[in-house]
Amino acid sequence: MLDANKLQQAVDQAYTQFHSLNGGQNADYIPFLANVPGQLAAVAIVTCDGNIYRAGDGDYRFALESISKVCTLALALEDVGPQAVQDKIGADPTGLPFNSVIALELHGGKPLSPLVNAGAIATTSLINAENIEQRWQRILHIQQQLAGEQVALSDEVNQSEQTTNFHNRAIAWLLYSAGYLYCDAMEACDVYTRQCSTLINTVELATLGATLAAGGVNPLTHKRVLQADNVPYILAEMMMEGLYGRSGDWAYRVGLPGKSGVGGGILAVVPGVMGIAAFSPPLDEEGNSVRGQKMVASVANQLGYNVFKG
């Protein structure tokens, strides 16, 4: 049994120690994100038996951004299976920035990882759908099933993203020309941009992690969202590429599958036990929340969780 007092203590200590840490800056290339108050911070745990522990601004809703890639990967695995995902997208770190075009050129147009922009756009195109709206609604629904029904598209974030996503449009056309996109290029890019533009809070993000930790069953709704056999593939990708250029460092120091987003959210999964999430907008140069990394790592360390430890 998990000790409730110990879990709340871990969350409180992580928040107290790091919520006002200096360093980093908001993502400034997306206007909406640049204007989020930089002092916001939160950390939360959701356990596999549905208990919630939290500190800070846990109700504040922020843009899901790249963490959405985890949800779309999960849906693609459900739709086409792990072998097709590996064959058509890949399962290897690129070793380059998350929005790299060079990574595509170096590997014949294959995106390699579903957790970088090129791979995520290609993953969006793998979703079974007859048209753009069905593709979008299925992706939104999986986000809601994994994290909570309150997850919804922000028109303001989406507009901010759609007017600045020229780089991703270029990536989509490169994928299409290389034969690694499985629907219309601009449809894939549009839906990908929408999936990044949903709003979530820190408790819901921890719920997403707890659903993965529980083998695909949401511990708050008690509904099975994913086949248990698909979850290890998601966690493997998160370990390899979840924190962009910091992924290796994260695995080395923290030892948990994780995923970050430029909206300031960060998620970690303790398989069979819990999801840990944090939020704070200022980012490091790789696009990861400075305070969020510290808070999640602190909780994991205090509780002794690391998948590489016996």
Question: Could you tell me what each predicted segment is?
Answer:
Residues 49-50, 63-86, 208, 276:
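Active-site SXXK
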Residues 19-55, 265-268:
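A short, well-structured edge-of-sheet supersecondary motif
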Residues 33-36, 112-113, 163, 255-259:
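Short Gly/Pro-enriched turn/cap motifs at secondary-structure boundaries
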Residues 133, 162-165, 173-233, 284-289:
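Penicillin-binding protein/beta-lactamase superfamily catalytic region
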Residues 2-23, 76-195:
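Active-site-adjacent helix/loop patches that line small-molecule binding or acyl-intermediate pockets
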Residues 215-310:
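Structured C-terminal helix/loop/strand segments within mature extracytoplasmic catalytic/sensor domains
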Residues 12-15, 19, 67-78, 228-248:
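A charged amphipathic helix-loop-strand protein-protein interaction module that recurs
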